[in-house]
C-alpha cells in the first residue's frame, strides 16, 4: 500500500475525504486515504450481503492499525448534509453512491468527485453529472493505464481466472472474445500467450464465420439493456451448442440465454453495469492500484494541478459525454 502511494505521489494532506468502508480488497480505500495524509477520513459503513456495518468497520480499523493509522478513520452509517459539506473529495464508491442531485447540492463549491474508474466506464446511475455541472463540482475518471497505476495489466489475469472458474482450460480452447473497448489488447494478448485460440470481434453481430467455440468471453461496454441480443445468442448456439457465455463486462439476458440453452458464468449475475468478476479475485494488488489511482485523480482535481502540470493531468480522464 505504501509503495502504491509513493508511486503516484499521493498527498492528501489538509483534505477531508468522504469514501466507503467496504469488505474484501476494497477495505483498503479509507486506510489509503489516511496513509496519504488526509486530515480527516469519513468512511460510510453499511450492512449488506457481505457483512454487517460493525464487522466492516472493525476489519477496516484492524487494517488501519496495522498500517499505523489506528483511530484516524471515522465510520458513519450514511451520508448527511453536514458531513458531505465538509468533504473536499467525495469518492464514487459503492457505499457513497448514488451521488444524487440533493447530495451534490450539499457539497461546497470546491469539492470534487473522482469516479474511481475510467471515464468511458461511467454509469449514469452513479453520479448526477448534470447537477455537478450546474454547481461547478469537478469530476473525472482515472487513467488506469498510467505507468504508476497500470490496472489494465491485470485484465488478462482476471479473464483467465473467470475462464478457469467456469471450467474452461484456456490452452488450445477456442474462445470468441467480444470486446468493443480499450480492454481488448489487455485481455487478448495474455490469453493468446496461454495458448488460447482467440477470435476477437467488436460485437456478436460481426461475421465470425461458422466455427465452433468452447467459450464466448463478453467484455462489452455496458449500455441500457443486454450487450448481446437473443438473436446473436441463437447464432452462437447453432454453431457452438456447448459454449459457455462468460460475463466479464456488460449485461447479459440470462433468461434468454437459458431459453436458448446457453450456460452463463458466473452463476450469480453482477449488478447492472458492473463487472462479472471483481479484481479482488486475483488478490489485493490490482485493487490497491485502482483505489490509489482514484484518490490521486481526486487530489489532482481538488488542487487543480492539471492546469499547470502536464504530468499531473495524466492521472485523470475527463468525462466527455
Per-segment meaning from a language model:
Residues 35, 39-66:
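Glycine-rich phosphate-binding loop and adjoining beta1-alpha1-beta2 segment
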Residues 140-174, 242-321:
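Adenosine-phosphate binding glycine-rich loop
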Residues 35-41, 193-202:
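Conserved S-adenosyl-L-methionine
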Residues 79-105, 203-281:
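Rossmann-like adenosine-cofactor binding region
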Residues 64-82, 195-212:
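A short, well-structured beta->alpha microelement
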Residues 85-168, 246, 250-258:
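Phosphate/diphosphate ligand-binding glycine-rich loop within oxidoreductases
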Residues 20-43:
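Histidine-anchored nucleotide/phosphate-binding helix
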Residues 13-27, 143, 155-200:
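Glycine-rich adenosine-cofactor-binding loop
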